[in-house]
Amino acid sequence: MSGVFIVFEGIDGAGKTTQLAYLHEALLSMRNHRVLVTREPGGTRIGEAVRRVLLDTGNSEMTGETEALLYAAARSQFTAEVVRPALARGEIVLSDRFLDSSLAYQGFGRGLELHRLRQVNFLATGGLRPDLTVLLDLPVAAAVARMDPDRRDRLEREGVDFFERVRRGYLELASADPGHYLIVNAEREAGVCASAIWARVRALLQDRPTFGGCPGLDGGS
């Protein structure tokens, strides 16, 4: 039995965590199927340890290459320990970030070569790709305004120019792979965004024999 892998992406402050929670709630109406909510970097004991190193504001000297390799290491453990086993059990996996975060942040944001990042992350994930990536797109000024200035981690403390590059990178990635991406205008009300996401996810699940007959897929959110 094969599960479904759905990833939420976007710059910090775009609302990924909120929309993931909305989708999780909608999916709970589907009886007889398990939904796993997770995040990366993190999701495993090793991954959470790496996450602390990556986001620690005391590590300001970290190079872009070190950052990219740490993310890939955490992703390798996350994929092997969490995602692949859950998909093999037929679960729906919802993840706050995955591979495209590295392409956007370390590739477009830090200026590292995309093909090198793809090579490293192919090793880390074994080529695993999400069935759907939901991109919460929000202007940088609006995203920064949503962040708590007293609780920003190392990456959230980057400048506006950095996040503009990351945002442009995400949009380029999405335009290059429209079949796997849903771009959501995160300036809209949260409920409107959630409805658009649920409509796309519902259509995705209806096309899967395992999920097509589940209660809750024929109606709205």
From Swiss-Prot:
It catalyses: dTMP + ATP = dTDP + ADP. ATP binds at residues 10-17. Keywords: ATP-binding, Kinase, Nucleotide biosynthesis, Nucleotide-binding, Transferase. Its EC number is 2.7.4.9. One of its GO terms (molecular function) is dTMP kinase activity. It comes from the Bacteria. PROSITE patterns: THYMIDYLATE_KINASE. Disulfide bonds: none annotated. SUPFAM superfamilies: P-loop containing nucleoside triphosphate hydrolases. InterPro entries: P-loop_NTPase, Thymidylate_kin-like_dom, Thymidylate_kin_CS, Thymidylate_kinase. GO terms for biological process: dTDP biosynthetic process; dTTP biosynthetic process; dUDP biosynthetic process. The keyword DNA repair does not apply. One of its GO terms (cellular component) is cytosol. Phosphorylation of dTMP to form dTDP in both de novo and salvage pathways of dTTP synthesis. Belongs to the thymidylate kinase family. This is Thymidylate kinase. It comes from Desulforudis audaxviator (strain MP104C). The lineage of its organism: Bacteria, Bacillati, Bacillota, Clostridia, Thermoanaerobacterales. The gene is tmk.
